[in-house]
Amino acid sequence: MSTKIQTSLTQNILLCLIGIMTIFLFESCARKIAFQASTIVPGAEGTVKVKKDNNSNYTIHVELSNLAEPRKLEPAMKTYVIWMETEQEPVKNIGQINSSSSFLSKRLKASFETVSSIKPTRIFITAEDDGTIQYPGTQILTTNGF
């Protein structure tokens, strides 16, 4: 083979490898989305980061700040519940942020992390009297779709 053909072939192989590596890199990158502004808790802010792991599960990490204690809402509630929507399930309770057990700090910051085998399409938070409730009440914070 001539040197020109070998160089061209080597360049094509390298370009293909870079393309494949780029696809895998973007596939494993986390998506980070901010919660929309809330009319119920106007100062509340937060983000949701969803990342696919090596086992094809999705790690869901929620960071919150300036989220008023649920007992200070009108009407007063006991806890915040985090919900997930997927293409397979309309809505699922994935956990709670309970201020009485110090999940919500004095600085009104909280974080939450869980793993799901199903990719979420939307994450939202409600204030509830019961953290094990199966259907959501009024939404406090919500994301657009992923």
Question: What do the PLM-derived regions correspond to, one by one?
Answer:
Residues 7, 19-20, 88:
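Low-complexity, intrinsically disordered regions enriched in charged/polar residues
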Residues 2, 29-146:
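N-terminal targeting/export leaders
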Residues 2-16:
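Bacterial N-terminal signal peptides that target proteins for export
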Residues 24-28:
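C-terminal motif of bacterial Sec signal peptides marking the signal peptidase cleavage site
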